[in-house]
Amino acid sequence: MPPKKFKDLNSFLDDQPKDPNLVASPFGGYFKNPAADAGSNNASKKSSYQQQRNWKQGGNYQQGGYQSYNSNYNNYNNYNNYNNYNNYNNYNKYNGQGYQKSTYKQSAVTPNQSGTPTPSASTTSLTSLNEKLSNLELTPISQFLSKIPECQSITDCKNQIKLIIEEFGKEGNSTGEKIEEWKIVDVLSKFIKPKNPSLVRESAMLIISNIAQFFSGKPPQEAYLLPFFNVALDCISDKENTVKRAAQHAIDSLLNCFPMEALTCFVLPTILDYLSSGAKWQAKMAALSVVDRIREDSANDLLELTFKDAVPVLTDVATDFKPELAKQGYKTLLDYVSILDNLDLSPRYKLIVDTLQDPSKVPESVKSLSSVTFVAEVTEPSLSLLVPILNRSLNLSSSSQEQLRQTVIVVENLTRLVNNRNEIESFIPLLLPGIQKVVDTASLPEVRELAEKALNVLKEDDEADKENKFSGRLTLEEGRDFLLDHLKDIKADDSCFVKPYMNDETVIKYMSKILTVDSNVNDWKRLEDFLTAVFGGSDSQREFVKQDFIHNLRALFYQEKERADEDEGIEIVNTDFSLAYGSRMLLNKTNLRLLKGHRYGLCGRNGAGKSTLMRAIANGQLDGFPDKDTLRTCFVEHKLQGEEGDLDLVSFIALDEELQSTSREEIAAALESVGFDEERRAQTVGSLSGGWKMKLELARAMLQKADILLLDEPTNHLDVSNVKWLEEYLLEHTDITSLIVSHDSGFLDTVCTDIIHYENKKLAYYKGNLAAFVEQKPEAKSYYTLTDSNAQMRFPPPGILTGVKSNTRAVAKMTDVTFSYPGAQKPSLSHVSCSLSLSSRVACLGPNGAGKSTLIKLLTGELVPNEGKVEKHPNLRIGYIAQHALQHVNEHKEKTANQYLQWRYQFGDDREVLLKESRKISEDEKEMMTKEIDIDDGRGKRAIEAIVGRQKLKKSFQYEVKWKYWKPKYNSWVPKDVLVEHGFEKLVQKFDDHEASREGLGYRELIPSVITKHFEDVGLDSEIANHTPLGSLSGGQLVKVVIAGAMWNNPHLLVLDEPTNYLDRDSLGALAVAIRDWSGGVVMISHNNEFVGALCPEQWIVENGKMVQKGSAQVDQSKFEDGGNADAVGLKASNLAKPSVDDDDSPANIKVKQRKKRLTRNEKKLQAERRRLRYIEWLSSPKGTPKPVDTDDEED
């Protein structure tokens, strides 16, 4: 409540003396008293309001009088003639312009008028409107337009609108050009003025809706409808709901007229211009809704072409001062940005949009971007999002030196990943000044140096690429020139719709834009449909569109792919298609073209969709691919057989549906031709090694007499001799077309005639083998060198191993081990002995089926030897990546990688270790657990309940045993030898595993954020690790999951069985560098000589059940792009001349340093006597005898 000495405004005004010159209005406010004016009607003393009432009555302004006024209006051109009427003697003072200031003036204290126009105001706006209409040029629809302001109901308005549309339907008027000629947009702009009656404004929207419906389906006449969008959007902010609804209907009708590509290239720029204008915020909200609808209705690849123009405008809207508009603008921008398919950026879209809206988040955003391993190709849409943030970071005065360092690194990385210079051309002028500023002003030399490198990359001159070479994307000018050149050749018959518009600039511009965008996204089918609709549906016009337009455009885009000549070969496949997996688009509107007898190498990064493409072909799911009756395809891949594993080889192949008519003799002959003798054919499928299983698949393909062989990593499990055989087989059969996915560069060099490369969701074709491809595309040099420039892996350092102070001490050992599988006639391994240290870099080599994997399984404890013993340090942790990576995750396809790792280690132990054969408790061993033993401690026989502790005892350990039915205070410490002697070896081993795992996990937090960081360290993107089920991952991504799982508990030894099988070249290089720089021991089985030769100085040759250890003088570090690391573990020159393991009798190889014994006096006398006698003996020896060395060792 206000203090009493103050009055509210109403009380204050009531207390004021009455002004004789002002008269109160019943609607609020005051009118000037006409009696106070010299030139007014002073004959009456009534109030101004009463005077107005009398004026209205005297002017016959009742309904009947107004109708009379309307009826007389048609006889006059404007309101100036109204001064001839007797009842309006005073009306000539206004001349149709409303009240003059001398007769009506709003008082300073008069509140604003309501939104509802008074009768006089409506009359005034109608007067103004009709005057403007009369000043326009006369057109066939002028008379109908002029009657709309006179209509009393919406029905009357619709009748006039119907007449207007009928006028468009008359011969000669049915072209959209009449919209411009009759200046309909100008008329409607006057209709929607706020002072006009709502009926007139609503009629304007109905005219737009009806015109849009009339021209719908008549391409390219919709080009003339574009100006109507601004008129309709302006009316969205109208105060009358009927007008708003009509405006929304008009916008929907307009949008329905345009084809999809026109929405993005023609309509969207108009909406963006409207958003940049000074329109009302309600109208801009409607414009954002139009943007959302275009986003929902259009293809993503078309929308990506608009990012450069759309993102800045939508960012401005998202930062508008009007809260409602800014909120909707932010949502629209985020949804718009999210259509971009970029795995590197997709987890950070929200942060990017937040940064665009709020510049204070630039440091956080730059820090996040600097931690991204950019792998996906960088395109114009990606740069449209990142360049504004990077540019702001470069120019902010508050940017720290660390932030500038991160920014210039991101700029350099992005620029290097741009395959097409045109993608970044428009952004270089934005980035150059900021980078140059950092070069000139940065305080740290390191930042200046990095900025200099980024500057050089930005300024790189690529004139060689520009010389007479198509840039890969049509510009609008090029599209226009192409259209005009080909329109000259058109046969304009009666069915050709475009004939009247061939010289019309509006239509030419419209068609040029559509031709350009459809060509740039390679959507030839949609472009052909549009041009056919424009030029007519006759056979001659269809042929003209297909040959003159589509064929010539495709030739322009595929210059490097020569079309078939007589001597090139027979074309067997030529189809356009798109390929998606789940929600991810792998290939978008690309072309697959195969020639008979050619061998195509399919190259691309992990997850690009190489195997998915081949599987789609094999399953008949690829659009346009010939059916199996026309073209036989056979998909050859290495796969695990489940219930079929117990079948013999002939029966296994005979089960194939396509080989039902093939005799068993023919099957046996085919198997014999690929190396299966009678003894091998008698084996079961499950007993075959990986290499023989692959040969089995190849034999099946031969029997099917396939026209196209689809080979997915055919050399993965083949030894050198079998790879040679496969190469010769493919080279000999020139009638078979092959599509090959392989990361073996030597194999691709030998067999390929063409390379198909994945580039920005398209298939690019290169003639020649892999070497020729690298010459044409130097950035693909990673196929010949091991580099981590495109992908990185980092392994956690191994933990401390108790008692092992030297990296050359043995930590795992096999002694005289013999092993044979159940039912086998001869042992797989016989009398094998070997040992490993923390510095070991061992390659296990040998032919398929020689027993390499068996040796590794025995060493890691997956198998138990029949004879001999396998010993290892009790705390030794081994990370094992099996030959078939899927076997680790086969039962967890529904889990994400993050969830799988949590499951695997949630109880502190590695669950995969517990599944090994050496850890499983047999029935006999379970029975033994109930056996009571006596350890001679005076308490008699007792049964063991569990082992609960461990401590050192001499050169071994003793274990704390909890006895069944005895309290913990009666626990006993029992030596390991005693427990093993009584048969509790697996119980001891289980506890050792638990202790080793606990020690390794001591520094690990099993929480999602830490696990995500661990996956990123091994090269798996966080988005995939956290949100993609394992069943949806590619082979290369699954291998990374298995590697991450094996490395989680910081192992000391890493055992890799065919690690290169599923990895692409980038990931292979990253793995090689990670192994080289890791400080633990490594054992690997691999037929990849390049990989093994660059890493392993020691080799174990396994053949015929025997193993031979062999050392090499040096490793070939030239395979690494960075020249190698001479200081890497296991590769130092000092280690090459001697074995990597110092052997002794201890399983843990913990040598105890002997303490030097002090000699007694008698011992010293005896020592001196020995030395004297030795010296005398030397003096009496022949001349030239070397002097013996004094030593305390009696034997010496």
UniProtKB/Swiss-Prot annotation:
The biological process GO terms on file are: mRNA transport; regulation of translational termination; ribosomal small subunit biogenesis
Q: Where is the ABC transporter domain?
A: 570-786, 812-1129
**Coiled-coil intervals, chain numbering:** none
**GO molecular function terms here?**
ATP binding; ATP hydrolysis activity; mRNA binding; ribosome binding; translation factor activity, RNA binding; translation termination factor activity
Q: Give the subcellular location.
A: Cytoplasm; Nucleus
Residues at which ATP 1 binds: G604, R605, N606, G607, A608, G609, K610, S611
Check the record and name the Gene3D superfamilies matching this protein.
2.40.50.990, Leucine-rich Repeat Variant, P-loop containing nucleotide triphosphate hydrolases
The entry's ATP 2-binding residues are: G846, P847, N848, G849, A850, G851, K852, S853
Bias class Polar residues marks the residues at 39-49, 103-113
> What range(s) does the Chromo domain occupy?
942-1003
Q: Recite the UniProt keywords alphabetically.
A: Amyloid, ATP-binding, Cytoplasm, mRNA transport, Nucleotide-binding, Nucleus, Phosphoprotein, Prion, Repeat, Transport
Would I find Glycosyltransferase among this entry's keywords? no
What InterPro entries is this protein classified in? AAA+_ATPase, ABC_transporter-like_ATP-bd, ABC_transporter-like_CS, ABCF_EF3_subfamily, ARM-like, ARM-type_fold, Chromo/chromo_shadow_dom, Chromo_domain
Residues the record lists as Phosphothreonine modifications: T1191
Q: Where is this region: Disordered?
A: 1-49, 103-125, 1137-1166, 1177-1196
Misc remark: Present with 37600 molecules/cell in log phase SD medium.
Please explain the role this protein plays, according to its UniProt record: May be involved in the mRNA export process. Forms the [NU+] prion and induces [PSI+] prion formation.
**PANTHER family the UniProt entry points to:** ATP-BINDING CASSETTE SUB-FAMILY F MEMBER 1, ATP-BINDING TRANSPORT PROTEIN-RELATED
Q: What is known of its domains?
A: The N-terminal 153 residues are responsible for the prion properties of NEW1.
Instruction: Please report the name of this protein according to its UniProt entry.
Output: [NU+] prion formation protein 1
What gene name is listed for this protein? NEW1
